[in-house]
C-alpha cells in the first residue's frame, strides 16, 4: 500500500500518450534491483492506451515498492509530497518540478520533436535537473542509478538564476507600462 507520508519518487508521463517507454524502464529498474527501496508512485496518464495501463498495473502488483495510478486531479499535491521526480520533461511538468523545487531526472522524448530534449539538456547544463537519455537499450541499472542519484542531487533552488520563475511579475510590469501609455 502506498504511504504518501514516506519518501517517494514521483514518476510522471504527463498525459501518458507516449509515456509507456518511461514507465517500462522505471518498472524494470525496480523489478531487477531490489536495492531501490524508496517507494515509487507511477502516474500513467489518462491518455495511455488502456491495454498498456492494464499490463503495467499487473506488473506493479508484483513489486512492493512500486504503486501506480492512472490519473490524479491534484497532481500538485503529489509533487509537493514527493521527495524526487522522474519525468519526461514536458513544459508543464518541468514548471512543476521548478515550482515545487524537486530533484529530478528528466528522460526526454526525442521523437517526433526535440523540445523535451532541448529543455532537459539546458536544465542539466544549468544544474536544475539531471538527464537520462533513452539509448534504445534502456538498461535497468541505468535507471536504478539515476533514481538513486536523486538522493544526492540538489533541488533546483540551489542554483540561483535571476528571473527564472519571474514570469508573472514580468508580465505585470509589461502590462503596467502599456496601460500607462497615452
Describe each PLM feature range.
Residues 74-118:
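A donor-sugar binding/catalytic signature common to diverse glycosyltransferases
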Residues 2-84, 136:
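Donor-nucleotide binding loops and adjacent catalytic segments primarily
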Amino acid at each position: 500500500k502506498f504511504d504518501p507520508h514516506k519518501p517517494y519518487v514521483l514518476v510522471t508521463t504527463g498525459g501518458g500518450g507516449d509515456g509507456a517507454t518511461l514507465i517500462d524502464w522505471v518498472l524494470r529498474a525496480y523489478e531487477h534491483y531490489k536495492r531501490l527501496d524508496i517507494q515509487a508512485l507511477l502516474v500513467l496518464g489518462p491518455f495511455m492506451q488502456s491495454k498498456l495501463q492494464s499490463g503495467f498495473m499487473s506488473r506493479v502488483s508484483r513489486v512492493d515498492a512500486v504503486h501506480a495510478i492512472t490519473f490524479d486531479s491534484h497532481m500538485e499535491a503529489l509533487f509537493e509530497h514527493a521527495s524526487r521526480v522522474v519525468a519526461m520533461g514536458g513544459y508543464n511538468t518541468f514548471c512543476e518540478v521548478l515550482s515545487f523545487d524537486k530533484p529530478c531526472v528528466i528522460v526526454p522524448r526525442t521523437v517526433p520533436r526535440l523540445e523535451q530534449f532541448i529543455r532537459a539538456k539546458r536544465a542539466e547544463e544549468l544544474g536544475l535537473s539531471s538527464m537520462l537519455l533513452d539509448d534504445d537499450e534502456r538498461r535497468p541499472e541505468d535507471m536504478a542509478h539515476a533514481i538513486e542519484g536523486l538522493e544526492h542531487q540538489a533541488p533546483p533552488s540551489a542554483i540561483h538564476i535571476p528571473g527564472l520563475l519571474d514570469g508573472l511579475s514580468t508580465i505585470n510590469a509589461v502590462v503596467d507600462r502599456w496601460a500607462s501609455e497615452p
